[in-house]
Each structure stands twice: as C-alpha cells, then as structure tokens.
Amino acid sequence: MLAKRLVPCLDVKDGKVVKGVQFRNHEIVGDIVPLAARYAEEGADELVFYDITASAHERVVDKSWVSRVAEQIDIPFCVAGGIKTISQARELLAFGADKISINSPALTDPSLISRLQDEFGRQCIVIGIDSFFDATSNSYKVKQFTGDEAATKDTQWFTQDWVEEVQKRGCGEIVLNVMNQDGVRGGYDIKQLSLVRAICDVPLIASGGAGTMAHFRDVFIEAKVDAALAASVFHKAIINIGELKAYLAAEDIAIRR
C-alpha cells in the first residue's frame, strides 16, 4: 500500500501567505519561506503554493520566491498561478518547483493539459479543481478565477465531468478543492470526494475542511484519497504535522514517517 501524504497548502497573495474562508476575506498569516521551512521541518510530505490572484490578474506566479523556497527545503513542492504556456512551466520547474499545477488556465484552454503532459510528463502535471455544491441544482459545479472574489465565475462544467476530462487529457494528479468546506474546519466532504474517487484513476488529493486529526483519518479511510491538503489548521498551529503522523500511524494508516 502506498503511504498517504500530508500536504500543507500556502495561498500566496502580494508576496505573503494568506488564508480565507470559503475563498473569501483573506488575511495574512505569515511569510512564504519561513512557513515553508517550518512545515518541512515538522514532517510535511510536500507543499503546494497557490498564487491565488495570478490567473484573475493575467500574470504568472512570482518566480523569485520559488527559488528561495527551493533553496530552503528538501521536500517536493508544487506551484500554481497563471501558468498558460510550456515556457512558463519550464521556467518554474527550472527555478526549483517539482510539479506545476493549473486550474483556471486549463478551464480556458483544456488542450494546455495535454501539451504540458507531452513536454514534461504526467508525473509533474497537477490539476486543481475548485468545486462548489450548488444547492439549487443539487449538483457539484466547477468555478473559475476563485482567488479574486470579484473575478470568480461559474463554468459550464459539472465537477465529475471535468474530473474525467482532465484525466483524458493527461493530468498526473487532481486536487479537489471543496469550496463550501474551505476554512470552516468542519471536516472534508467525504461524499463528494468518494464520488470523485470512483471515477479518478490518478492520485486524488482532498482539500477543504480539515479541523481535527480525526478528519484526516476519516478522509483517508472513507474517501480513499491519496493525500490530504490543509492550510488553516497548520498555519494556526492547531495541528502539528509530526503529531498528526503519529496519530494516523496509530490508526493503522500507512503514512510516511
């Protein structure tokens, strides 16, 4: 059995790490490099950095802090933010990122997924999906440009359809960001993640809702995800990664130690 991964998420805005609730009202929580170093020291398996306003503001993630992170940590990390071309992706990988993630640009141009996969290989292409439960239609739908509340818009895609589409086009991993659960620390959306798991043949990373150690246990056991991403519980030191790993190991979950 492959070991499950714990992945702290660092949302970046204007050169600082920020955190919001349900993708709104972001507040500054710290500096990029010190937080990255702290999580690596605590035992994180990898890190994800999202430049949350890059796509909406028509720019690419700032490469200067990418190189500084690469110099400070010895665990894999993934970078996202406005990546639209092979050359932009190549530059970020050259600056030290191990994976690149695309979200809104893939929705605008789905062929980007295939082009990146052809150039760099499936293993370093991650697709982020911002999924929102629409109570009116009783369905899960994909939203775009979610890093800027004023720019956020609905798309034509139902979440499960988009999950299938990005796999056909060659993605290597999927991060399912459950917007309704984001930042509220009430637990992962086991129902939605289980539905996606049933049609997802690539590694699936759960994102949105972690509040207790038991939430991590539940999402690994019940939704059978490959990794769990979290932000506020780590930023606010509610949960220590090393202690979380010990807890999960005691619950008979295969975890990297």
Swiss-Prot record:
InterPro entries according to UniProt: Aldolase_TIM, His_biosynth, HisF, IGPS_HisA/HisF, RibuloseP-bd_barrel
Gene Ontology cellular-component annotations: cytoplasm
GO MF assignments: imidazoleglycerol-phosphate synthase activity; lyase activity
UniProt function note: IGPS catalyzes the conversion of PRFAR and glutamine to IGP, AICAR and glutamate. The HisF subunit catalyzes the cyclization activity that produces IGP and AICAR from PRFAR using the ammonia provided by the HisH subunit.
Record-stated family: Belongs to the HisA/HisF family.
Subunit structure as annotated in this protein's UniProt entry: Heterodimer of HisH and HisF.
Keywords: Amino-acid biosynthesis, Cytoplasm, Histidine biosynthesis, Lyase
Pathway named in the protein's UniProt entry: Amino-acid biosynthesis; L-histidine biosynthesis; L-histidine from 5-phospho-alpha-D-ribose 1-diphosphate: step 5/9
Active-site feature positions: 11, 130
Record-given protein name: Imidazole glycerol phosphate synthase subunit HisF
Pfam family membership, one: His_biosynth
GO BP annotations, alphabetical order: L-histidine biosynthetic process
Enzyme Commission number(s): 4.3.2.10
Residue runs in coiled coils: none
Reaction equation(s) it catalyzes: 5-[(5-phospho-1-deoxy-D-ribulos-1-ylimino)methylamino]-1-(5-phospho-beta-D-ribosyl)imidazole-4-carboxamide + L-glutamine = D-erythro-1-(imidazol-4-yl)glycerol 3-phosphate + 5-amino-1-(5-phospho-beta-D-ribosyl)imidazole-4-carboxamide + L-glutamate + H(+)
The organism's place on the tree of life at top rank: Bacteria
Organism classification: Bacteria, Pseudomonadati, Pseudomonadota, Gammaproteobacteria, Alteromonadales
Compartments, record wording: Cytoplasm
